[in-house]
Regions:
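Short substrate-entry loop that stabilizes the transition state in hydrolases
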Residues: 50-52, 60-97, 186-187, 218-219
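Alpha/beta-hydrolase fold nucleophile elbow
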Residues: 144-156
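N-terminal cap/lid segment of alpha/beta-hydrolase-fold proteins
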Residues: 20-49
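Short glycine-enriched nucleophile-adjacent loop
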Residues: 139, 159-171
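Alpha/beta-hydrolase active-site loop
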Residues: 103-143
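C-terminal catalytic histidine-bearing segment of alpha/beta-hydrolase fold enzymes
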Residues: 234-277
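Alpha/beta-hydrolase
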Residues: 58, 88-90, 180, 242
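The feature captures the conserved acid-bearing segment of alpha/beta-hydrolase catalytic domains
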Residues: 176-238
Length: 277
């Protein structure tokens, strides 16, 4: 009987802690339209009415980004610093309608003709970007979002999306971009995405801080895009590979996910604060 009481007490304590975290970040699940598809996103904001500067967070290629700690962990970085966060989930991910990009690419890859490489670029430039920008448009309607102080960030496929969105800063309203490990998993086998992201360096006019962990799948995105920025005199486009001072599990792609976000948290908050001055 005593053991059952302890278990019940522990369960209540855990539920209370989870409820406190959700309340602290004012987490809300929302839906929005991208064309004829209904997509899902998560919004967070500090206590109070705002409006707050807002981080648009782009997830990677994982099937269920809404089912893990990713978005809450992003909120834990930015909400205490005074930011709202909006994380749209692109088509086919989690509860969002539509086809899943990885399934589409796998079908093309199975043909063995290299068409998956050009398709990767095409889907990022069209469907994936359309979904992200639909999410941004929705976020701008939220009363706690300051549409004049928008920044964008994301990892892996989300890093690609961050760079593509940054190209449209003038029309969308982004003030800075933080791509993390953009295309690192596909870089070595996809020259098409290499060239497309080099083109982004030329197109982007807002501050960019591209970061990677020391053990990423490829460090070429930081090296190549940083060199291209230096070559054309884009001083606002900076890259940084972190020193291997973190645990091994956080030295890998996207800093190992949510558990490694603390590694770049301080740099990200400072970067955005400087860009929004």
């Amino acid at each position: 009987m005593r053991m059952n009481t302890v278990r019940v007490t522990l369960a209540i304590a855990l539920l209370t802690a989870a409820a406190h975290q959700t309340a602290r970040f004012n987490k809300t699940r929302v839906t929005f339209k991208s064309g004829n598809l209904t997509l899902v996103g998560y919004a967070y904001h500090p206590d109070g009415n705002g409006p707050f500067p807002t981080v648009i967070w782009n997830h990677g290629s994982e099937k269920n980004p809404g089912g893990g700690p990713q978005f809450d962990s992003v909120a834990a970085v930015f909400v205490p610093a005074g930011y709202a966060v909006f994380a749209p989930m692109r088509r086919g991910h989690s509860d969002s309608e539509g086809g899943y990009i990885v399934d589409t690419l796998n079908v093309a890859r199975a043909r063995g003709d290299g068409s998956d490489r050009t398709l990767l670029v095409k889907l990022h430039e069209t469907q994936q970007l359309d979904d992200q920008l639909a999410g941004v448009a929705y976020a701008k309607t939220l009363p706690f979002v300051d549409a004049r102080r928008l920044v964008v960030a994301g990892c892996s496929f989300g890093g690609i999306q961050t760079l593509l969105a940054a190209e449209r800063a003038r029309s969308v309203g982004f003030r800075a971009a933080l791509p993390i490990s953009p295309a690192a998993l596909t870089w070595s086998r996809t020259p098409e995405i290499q060239e497309r992201l080099k083109r982004s360096v030329h197109e982007i006019t807002i501050p960019v801080l591209l970061i990677q962990p020391p053990g990423d799948a490829s460090l070429e995105p930081a090296r190549v895009l940083g060199a291209e920025a230096a070559r054309i005199g884009k001083k606002q486009f900076r890259t940084m590979v972190y020193a291997p001072t973190m645990p091994d599990s956080q030295r890998v792609h996207c800093f190992g996910g949510a558990k490694g976000f603390h590694t770049w948290a301080k740099d990200a908050v400072q970067f955005f604060a400087d860009a929004l001055k």
